[in-house]
Amino acid sequence: MIKTVLFDLDGTLLNTIDDLADAGNWVCAQNGWPTFTVAQFKLMVGNGIPKLVERFSPADARTPAQLAATLAQFTARYDAHKEDKTAPYPGIPALLDALKAEGIQCAVFSNKADALCGGIIAHYFGTGRFDAVRGNRPGVPTKPDPTGLYALMTELGADPTATLFMGD
């Protein structure tokens, strides 16, 4: 029986792709680079913001210094506009409430920066629906590496054989 459900954030709980694409395209336009469709951005996401920035940056703009500058541009723009179009997927708040009513622990584990995750969750889902919210933190590899997931399960006292992860 499942006793704990861990959720990814972007693309699982929240439809964030439009705000991610808008921020990415703004950075591209500011730098005179080609822009992309939302469908193209969907193919670029899934391994954290630094990897997304690398993927939309032209090959000749991928030195470590250039990527750091582009990441700073993207982060500033996204932080200012991360709630413009983002919304929970239909049925997600009701699902979370049903899981909690059954006594199932719920937590978030995302490749999005840890500093952003708590505020985003509070904004869209309030408090009390999640037992823990964890984003990308220094020293913890991003998904698909399972290190952070195992650490979160340990923190929650969750049995891995009774835990479900939803997302990528």
Give the positions of each predicted feature.
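Metal-dependent phosphoesterase signature
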Residues: 55-94
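Helix-loop "lid/cap" segments that line or gate small-molecule binding pockets
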Residues: 27-28, 48-63, 120-123, 152-153
